[in-house]
């Protein structure tokens, strides 16, 4: 067995990007209603799909 350099997946201390600090259970940004409104798109448009 020859000694090999550790690849990125086997590093002892991989340099991972740090996530923003947030208290447990707090959303990162925006409420559920806002997110739903943002992602609903054209579903609630009365003029869509005539």
UniProtKB/Swiss-Prot annotation:
Region annotation (Disordered) ranges: 1-50
GO biological process entries: asexual sporulation; sporulation resulting in formation of a cellular spore
Residues forming coiled coils: none
Superkingdom as given in the UniProt entry: Bacteria
Induction summary: Expressed only in the forespore compartment of sporulating cells.
Compositionally biased tracts (Basic residues): 33-50
Localization (cell): Spore core
Pfam families linked: SspP (PF08179)
Keyword vocabulary terms for this entry: Sporulation
HAMAP family named among the record's database cross-references: SspP (MF_00666)
Name the UniProt record assigns to this protein: Small, acid-soluble spore protein P
Gene this protein is translated from: sspP
């Amino acid at each position: 067995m020859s000694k090999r350099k550790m690849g990125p997946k086997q590093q002892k201390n991989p340099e991972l990007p740090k996530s923003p600090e947030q208290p447990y259970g707090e959303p990162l940004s925006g409420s559920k209603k806002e997110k739903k409104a943002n992602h609903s798109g054209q579903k609630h448009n009365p003029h869509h799909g005539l």
